[in-house]
Amino acid sequence: MNKKTIAMLGAGSWGTAVAIHLAKIGHKTLLWSHNPQHVALMAEQHSNPAYLPGIPFPENLIPSDDLIECVQLADYVIIAVPSHAFAEIINKIPKPTQGLAWLTKGVDPASHQLLSQLVASRFGVDFPIAVISGPSFAKEVARFLPTALTLASNNTNYQKKMHQLFHHDNIRVYLSDDLIGVQLCGAVKNILAIACGISDGLGYGANAKAALITRGLAEMTRLGLSMGARQDTFLGLAGVGDLVLTCTDDQSRNRRFGLLLGREVPIPEAEHQIGQVVEGKHNAAQICAIANKNKVEMPICEQINALLHGIVHAQQAVNNLMSRPAKEE
């Protein structure tokens, strides 16, 4: 593939890591942040000390705070902002020429819509889109360690171009057309990672964590099937792959947040200690609302949502789950 200009909108750890990957394989990459001071610091230090310290930028990775210019200069636009900022970004930018891809995992907090629905409302239902998801920690991608991702799209030509853009010796990209399933996996797994963190914070051990992952996967799958997703998506990289990674490794900020809650650290202090957006906290209420609308039981997600809203404490949430009526698996 000829080398392209990429606009990466969002300079958190994940957006920065993917920007570094794209720049390392030869694409000119514009890394946008809304904060001019953050941009100046990245330009001065040729790295992102706030979110991905210790990993230098390639020369062709250029920080910027000019959102419109980044989009206008780019051959391809990728969004990597938190889910609560996604709608604001797509409403500000001009329509990208090729299509729009995103790394964001979550749903819109205001409308409870999938991010693909927001984009369809803004740019049209036939506008090419792609969602990139899967088991991937930022530092490992930035360090060129082997990673496999799922790329779901509504347009085969655009999907092929995005595949060529990302695919390299260190990143293997699998293709999907299940936009609903891939997006739901990315949103729900963060809530389940909080649950696993809480369980470990309470000292409950490996058995409890395995049960949460397994029953959490069942919840995720039920919700997806009710919305038209395919079951095999939940058994793939975007589903069980990302779920296991996020629930078991302390690089996951959602899991670390749960660990703190399990150790009785107050929610505001836990968020402060994490220092970055905890998507599972922001998306728990939205996922529960979507589940209620679709008449799907998601008891683990419901207990995490209740805990986050101060209705139950960690031990009580566990007791509520363990005392549920017996049922077939």
Swiss-Prot record:
InterPro entries named in the record: 6-PGluconate_DH-like_C_sf (IPR008927), 6PGD_dom2 (IPR013328), G3P_DH_NAD-dep (IPR006168), G3P_DH_NAD-dep_C (IPR006109), G3P_DH_NAD-dep_N (IPR011128), NAD(P)-bd_dom_sf (IPR036291)
GO biological process, one term: carbohydrate metabolic process
Pathway info: Membrane lipid metabolism; glycerophospholipid metabolism
Enzyme superclass (EC): oxidoreductase
UniProt binding sites for NADPH: 13-14, 34, 105, 138, 253, 277, 279
A GO molecular-function annotation: glycerol-3-phosphate dehydrogenase [NAD(P)+] activity
EC number(s) from the headed UniProt entry: 1.1.1.94
GO cellular component term of the entry, any: cytosol
Ligand binding (sn-glycerol 3-phosphate): 105, 134, 136, 189, 242, 252-254
A Pfam cross-reference name: NAD_Gly3P_dh_C
Active site: 189
Record field: catalytic activity: sn-glycerol 3-phosphate + NAD(+) = dihydroxyacetone phosphate + NADH + H(+); sn-glycerol 3-phosphate + NADP(+) = dihydroxyacetone phosphate + NADPH + H(+)
Compartments where found: Cytoplasm
Keywords, in A-Z order: Cytoplasm, Lipid biosynthesis, Lipid metabolism, NAD, NADP, Nucleotide-binding, Oxidoreductase, Phospholipid biosynthesis, Phospholipid metabolism
Family of the protein in this entry: Belongs to the NAD-dependent glycerol-3-phosphate dehydrogenase family.
Function: Catalyzes the reduction of the glycolytic intermediate dihydroxyacetone phosphate (DHAP) to sn-glycerol 3-phosphate (G3P), the key precursor for phospholipid synthesis.
PANTHER family: GLYCEROL-3-PHOSPHATE DEHYDROGENASE, GLYCEROL-3-PHOSPHATE DEHYDROGENASE [NAD(+)] 2, CHLOROPLASTIC
Protein name: Glycerol-3-phosphate dehydrogenase [NAD(P)+]
Species name: Legionella pneumophila (strain Paris)
